[in-house]
Design a protein with these regions (language model features):
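Short, acidic/hydrophobic/Gly-rich beta-strand patch recurrent on exposed beta strands
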Residues: 8, 17-20, 47-52, 100-101
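Generic structural motif
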Residues: 25-35, 74-77
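Envelope-exposed proteins and targeting segments
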Residues: 13-15, 23, 31, 44-46, ...
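Zn2+-dependent peptidoglycan hydrolase active-site motif and core
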Residues: 29-64
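Short, conserved catalytic or interaction motifs in soluble domains
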Residues: 40, 65-68, 85-88
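Short glycine/threonine/proline-enriched tight-turn/helix- or strand-capping micro-motif at secondary-structure
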Residues: 1-28
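Surface-exposed connector loops and short turns at secondary-structure junctions
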Residues: 25-28, 69, 108
Length: 115
């Protein structure tokens, strides 16, 4: 889906969603899984990728104060960290949770899996 990014003043294709949030708000795991990676990304800041099983992964970005590390098993609803100040790529949009999902490495629409 093509999305307009006010900070960049341009449209870009994005398979993720940016959920407006309040800085320091807790971020909860959307499903049971295992933390596959924790990386620092210029666009999405501190980013956690969780393996959910059956080829599915969930990606959470714009985080700080993580409560999980690579290899940790996480239960649905468990706090994995807090919302950080936005990276420079989201400065106009403000604090947000970057959330994406993949199936077998291919981006899928997260709205199809969230209740």
């Amino acid at each position: 889906e093509t999305v307009y990014y006010p900070t960049l003043d341009q449209y870009r294709v994005s398979s993720a969603i940016a959920l407006q949030a309040v800085e320091d708000a807790p971020v909860y795991a959307a499903a049971d899984g295992q933390v596959l990676s924790v990386v620092q990304d210029a666009c999405t800041g501190t980013t956690v990728t969780m393996e959910l099983g059956n080829g599915y992964q969930a990606v959470y970005g714009q985080l700080k104060d993580l409560t999980v590390a690579e290899g940790d098993t996480v239960k649905e609803g468990e706090v994995i960290g807090n919302i950080s100040a936005p990276t420079k790529y989201y400065s106009v949009e403000g604090p947000n949770l970057y959330f994406a999902m993949k199936k077998d490495g291919v981006p899928v629409d997260p709205f199809e899996y969230l209740e």
